[in-house]
């Protein structure tokens, strides 16, 4: 059953508490998801009644009813000073790759599974969000990766990633051969199913499942995690975030290789191509409720043991 709010026009901005850090708020969510739509409707109504200017990402705006200002992600980035993403970490990652180029805060309402990046509960967000809007929040910057594919010295494709850039064999799993260089220094050759280059943000995602270490978000580091290497001695390695990672694909590999950015964007790779992964100049400005504790998040999301004494 849908929720039918009678949404009136925003009040004058002068009605907003003068300590408020935000004035124009963008709402982003997972399209065609009933729970997300209900939360977005509540958010839109609640924010509008408090006098905020509210923009809604166009993919979900049509499902929220009339009197909604629908815009794309780029316009949210340009016009808003806060974006609220309703969904799971995948929705947050997709929005973050676009919004990181703008100077706005981003906070998440969890409508997914784990929700490492989405702090607010979907059914009781008002109290915590009210404090955030009154200026009681912690800010955390997360750097992104830039992944580039070169063919015969020419740039063929590029994109950014919040979590990780992954070299892999495409749709059919099989072993591939490649060399890895750190700052143009040869590190090793690999025969493996691929390679994960992860940020600290991504170290609790795909890299963790592949046996990588957890990096705290404030670390300026990257972790390289081989995927099912055909050796007994290969281990993940952590390098400085300023390092340039180069992977050279053997010309003897088959075709249809890919580099995936956060599992969303796929860059085609051919035998002999070079993949460059480095830290992007863009940063995501995450907003957390005051007192956010990263290790508490790890305990609750990953099921770590409770304190014994």
UniProtKB/Swiss-Prot annotation:
EC number: 2.7.1.23
Lineage: Bacteria, Pseudomonadati, Pseudomonadota, Gammaproteobacteria, Alteromonadales
Statement: the UniProt record of this protein carries the keyword Transmembrane: no
Family to which the UniProt record says this protein belongs: Belongs to the NAD kinase family.
A GO cellular component annotation in the UniProt record: cytoplasm
UniProt function note: Involved in the regulation of the intracellular balance of NAD and NADP, and is a key enzyme in the biosynthesis of NADP. Catalyzes specifically the phosphorylation on 2'-hydroxyl of the adenosine moiety of NAD to yield NADP.
Organism: Shewanella baltica (strain OS155 / ATCC BAA-1091)
Residues binding NAD(+), per UniProt: 89-90, 163-164, 174, 191, 193, 204-209
Keywords: ATP-binding, Cytoplasm, Kinase, NAD, NADP, Nucleotide-binding, Transferase
Catalytic activity annotation: NAD(+) + ATP = ADP + NADP(+) + H(+)
The protein's name: NAD kinase
EC main group: transferase
Pfam families cross-referenced by the UniProt entry: NAD_kinase (PF01513), NAD_kinase_C (PF20143)
Compartments where found: Cytoplasm
